[in-house]
Curated annotation (Swiss-Prot):
It comes from Methanobrevibacter smithii (strain ATCC 35061 / DSM 861 / OCM 144 / PS). One of its GO terms (biological process) is tetrahydromethanopterin biosynthetic process. Belongs to the GTP cyclohydrolase IV family. This is GTP cyclohydrolase MptA. Binds 1 Fe(2+) ion per subunit. PANTHER family: GTP CYCLOHYDROLASE MPTA.
């Protein structure tokens, strides 16, 4: 005879306080995304899954979260059209049906993503890694379930400090004027690339995706890379290294500039997205001459962003 085990999660808590997010973090899965006439993409994503909890319930049914993730992954195993943000939306829908007491459900996914690129001069092909991110949030409103999904990426690049570069330039100008006239000195200043301290920049960009639209992860990665002083590359021969350093120092940017660059580029590329589309841009630069890092962030809607940019 089977033993009937108690379900203590449904008990009334001694302290009647509702909780914003309860769930599981760090759920790792193997995900194979089929592609028409191409090799499948193999990912090992990490999922975080949460629901809110009403004040009259002691706990959530925790096992239902990884259960929902596993069930959806099995369902999409042979689907060549599914995108990672749509996958997250499907998991949210599944969790909504399993947690009937929840008014809000959230799932986020992060995975390493490999993409190919060429070194700038020798054109050697190299495998590069970025973090691909996806998220979906579901709400119960007026008896209906509404789900909003997002896709994004986190990419490493290189940034060069404009302030230090101008200081070096001014210092070198004064030295040149000791033995050159002003006209010749100016020609040198216009020709030579000046030194500065640089950083390993980590750019993050996320955008909500409407139901009838698609945003490619590769496009997000490209926007992030182009918003810094220079992309970085795993394989650089001497000519590539020279070009990377020179190109970066010809495009110095503050951490604030990186965020603004990302926002401007994504607003122009997806200007026809709904006005309430939420966009998040974040940049953290690992300083070379300080022990601390520099950080900047903007969270906005497409409508607010277009109004600021007047587009």
């Amino acid at each position: 005879m089977a033993v009937c085990l108690p379900d203590t999660q449904d008990d009334t808590p001694s302290i009647p306080i509702k909780l914003t997010r309860v769930g599981v973090t760090g759920v790792k899965k193997l995900l194979q995304l089929e592609r028409n006439n191409k090799r499948p993409i193999i990912l090992v994503p990490t999922f975080d899954a949460f629901v809110d909890l009403p004040n009259d319930q002691k706990g959530v049914h925790m096992s239902r979260n990884p259960e929902a993730i596993s069930e959806v992954l099995d369902e999409v195993a042979n689907d060549s059209s599914v995108e990672v943000e749509t996958l997250c939306a499907k998991i949210v829908s599944k969790m909504m049906s399993k947690h009937e007491y929840a008014k809000r459900v959230e799932i986020s996914m992060t995975t390493d993503y490999m993409f190919m690129k060429e070194s700038p001069v020798t054109k050697n092909k190299t495998q590069e890694m970025a973090k691909l991110k996806a998220k979906a949030v579901g709400y119960r409103e007026d008896g209906e379930i509404k789900i909003r999904k997002s896709i994004g990426a986190e990419v490493i690049g290189m940034t060069v400090c404009p302030c230090a570069q101008e200081s070096v330039k001014e210092s070198d100008k004064n030295k040149l004027l000791e033995f050159l006239d002003e006209e010749t000195t100016q020609k040198v200043l216009d020709t030579v690339t000046f030194a500065s301290h640089n950083q390993r920049g980590v750019g993050t960009l996320l955008i909500e995706v409407p139901e009838d639209r698609e945003v490619k992860g590769e496009d997000i990665i490209e926007i992030i890379e182009e918003s810094m002083s220079s992309p970085v590359c795993e394989l650089l021969k001497r000519p590539d290294e020279n070009a990377t350093v020179l190109n970066a120092h010809k495009k110095p940017v503050f951490v604030e500039d990186c965020v603004r660059n990302m926002m401007e580029k994504i607003a122009k590329k997806y200007a026809d997205f709904p006005e309430d589309t939420i966009i998040t841009s974040r940049q953290e630069n690992h300083e070379s001459i300080h022990r601390h890092n520099a950080f900047a962030e903007k969270v906005t809607t497409m409508g607010e962003l277009k109004e600021e940019l007047r587009i």
